[in-house]
Every structure is written in structure tokens, then in C-alpha cells.
Amino acid sequence: MRILPRSVEKLIESFSRLPGIGPKTAGRLTFYLLHVPQTELDNFSDAIKNLKLQTVYCSKCFNIGETDPCVICSSLDRDEDLVCVVEQPIDILSIEKTGKYKGVYHVLHGRIDPLNNIGPDEIRISELIKRVKTGHIREIILATNPNMEGEATAMYINRELKTLSSEAGSRSAGNQGPIVTRIAHGLPVGGDIEYADEVTLTKAMEGRREY
């Protein structure tokens, strides 16, 4: 015998598929929405429906936006020779809140995670390498999260960039590749950039070291 209406069950199942939301939380969210006015529910529904319909990926940095290129890549006030590599678009929001970073970004949309079958080919590392090959990038800042997967991703990218520089020629030959740096102190091991405050992120960016 079905106790809950099918529409309620379906919404609970949908919420449960979201990361970090278990069945109990999904149930609480669903029953909360039952008490929300229909106009608010309609606005919520429209926001979800338009989430992908009205957003695009920037062809330069793979951030999300309403236009391609995105507002950051299109800005004349940005230093295009300085590229900060992040795991997700939400990390850009955290770094931008510091007001200190004036370069551009490259969004990987993930991190190397062998336990979940996510390798280098599943995230946008090859696009970063291509960007380095075709551009005039002075510095690459590796701002992946300071956890096991983030460190593995940073190490892999660093190795690929060093190999690329070696193939292009030695520094003395005038074919110097970009400096590769890693965000430094301030971020705890195992922490996520998304949850770091502005002061901590500013210290991490200013204290970055060559990788």
C-alpha cells in the first residue's frame, strides 16, 4: 500500500540523487515545499528548467555563463597571461570574493579520482595543455583543493606542463614555458576552496610557490 502520493515520492527520490542529500533530508525538503505558495514553487521550477537552457560553457576557460566567452574572459581588465586552474565553477566565486586576483581561470570540472573511475581524460586537462601550447601564458596557478584527489590532480598537471616545456626546449634556448605555482598556506589539508573565507584564500594566493 502506497502511503505517500506518487508525486511526493518522486520528488523525494529526485532530491536524494543530489550530492550530500540523504533520504531524510530529501523528505524534509519535499514536505517543506508542500507548504510553499504555488507562485514560489513555479519560480523554483522555472529556475531549475532554465538552469541549462540559459547557460553555456565558455570555450576559453570552461566556466559557466550566459555568453561565450564568459564575462571574465571578455574583460579587458584581466591579465590573460595568468591562469588559475580550479576544479569547479563555484571555486571561481570564492576566489573572486577576495578581490585580489586579476587573472583568468581554467575550470577542470572535476579532479582525478581513481576510486570513482575519474582519470585525466574525464576532466579538462587536455584543453588546458592546448591552451598553454597556443597561448602566451606566463604563470599557471594550481588551485585544486588541498586533499588527496586535488593534490593528485595538481601533480599530474604539473608533470604534463613540465614535459611540455621540455619538449619545447630548455629555458636557456628562449622557449621558457609558464611558471607553475601551487596555492600555499592558509588552506587546511582536506579542505575545500568553496568553503574558505576571503582572508584565507587571499593568503593562499599570495603565498603560492613554484611547483
What residue ranges belong to the model's regions?
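Conserved phosphate-handling catalytic cores of large alpha/beta enzymes
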Residues: 177-185, 192-211
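Extended interfacial segments that mediate partner engagement and assembly in macromolecular machines
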Residues: 26, 75-144
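Extended, charge-rich low-complexity interaction segments
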Residues: 135-148, 153, 205-211
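Switch/connector loops and helix/strand junctions flanking conserved nucleotide-binding motifs
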Residues: 92-95, 114-116, 149-152, 190-193
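Short Gly/Thr/Asp-enriched flexible loops that form oxyanion-binding sites at enzyme active sites
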Residues: 150-162
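Cys/His-rich Zn2+-binding cysteine-cluster or related metal-binding knuckle/ribbon modules and their
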Residues: 2-9, 17, 30-92
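Intrinsic disorder/low-complexity segments
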Residues: 163-179
